[in-house]
Amino acid sequence: MSRIFAYCRISTLDQTTENQRREIESAGFKIKPQQIIEEHISGSAATSERPGFNRLLARLKCGDQLIVTKLDRLGCNAMDIRKTVEQLTETGIRVHCLALGGIDLTSPTGKMMMQVISAVAEFERDLLLERTHSGIVRARGAGKRFGRPPVLNEEQKQVVFERIKSGVSISAIAREFKTSRQTILRAKAKLQTPDI
């Protein structure tokens, strides 16, 4: 026999899950108190980072039903929601979202809804990649360097090159500049083959 669970999440400590519990009960779902999982955590946290949700996942079995009042209870964004619903569906768990009319997200109508959500998730991901790429291009155009700051500045690199030309050992130069031999060898290589 299938069991019914509810997941109620609130973001701040001054909120309660009472409204969500009432909404679930008003929709006709009778859920045992021990099968209502409540969590006080930010909605920006992915479901994988939610301890209460992870405890719920460990308890759910094939044939069980999960009730949420809103879709955002299942993830922090469209991609996370899609991943969560897919994970639950693969396990054989039916997911009902009351904000979508109590629709079972694993039913044909629910699957269509999830395809729309998947399209939105893909669109979100593409926008994020596009913004990231344009931000990197803009930063590089403004002369922004990426990665760690160089160990040696240009003046120090010239001194290193002069020391190498005068026969000082790589190890001695590395000790003088308090850096590794590899850093000195990289500086030497760059000065011998300047950027074209």
Curated annotation (Swiss-Prot):
CDD domains: HTH_Hin_like, SR_ResInv
Pfam families per UniProt: HTH_7, Resolvase
Resolvase/invertase-type recombinase catalytic domain location: 3-143
Lipid metabolism recorded as keyword: no
Family annotation (SUPFAM superfamilies): Homeodomain-like, Resolvase-like
GO molecular function, one term: hydrolase activity
UniProt-listed Enzyme Commission number(s): 3.1.22.-, 6.5.1.-
Keyword DNA-binding annotated: yes
GO biological-process terms attached to the record: DNA integration; DNA recombination
Family the entry assigns: Belongs to the site-specific recombinase resolvase family.
Protein name (Swiss-Prot/TrEMBL): Serine recombinase PinR
Organism of origin: Escherichia coli (strain K12)
